[in-house]
Amino acid sequence: MAIYKYSNKVEAVWENADHCSCGSNDCHPNSHRECGICHETIFYGSHETVQNQRNSRGAWNLDHIKPISRGGSNQTKNLQAVHIFCNRSKGNRY
């Protein structure tokens, strides 16, 4: 598994995300999590900042649970790890 180092905020949000329920014997505990929106698998090494990963199946980024435009904050408690396409689909909804 490749080693990635993200910002402290990204790492904190990843750690707070629900663990995947894939049941795979080769599922490393820190390599998968569940998308906060659709609850499908996201992959640690597929964060949007990793080159060539933005369009991968498990690509993810940070979503503001309550959008900034609706009074939300950039605090970790208002952020969740989600698929990039789920984040785009959610848009400004809360």
Predicted regions and their residues:
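Residue-level signal for well-ordered alpha-helical scaffold segments within enzymatic catalytic domains
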Residues: A12, I84-F85
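Basic side chains
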Residues: R33, R88-R93
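Short, charged surface segments at domain edges that flank catalytic/cofactor-binding sites
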Residues: M1-V50
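Histidine-centered nuclease catalytic patch
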Residues: I42-A81, Y94
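Cys/His/Pro-rich metal-binding microdomains
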Residues: G36, Q80, I84
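Cys/His-rich metal-chelating microdomains
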Residues: T41-Y44, F85-S89
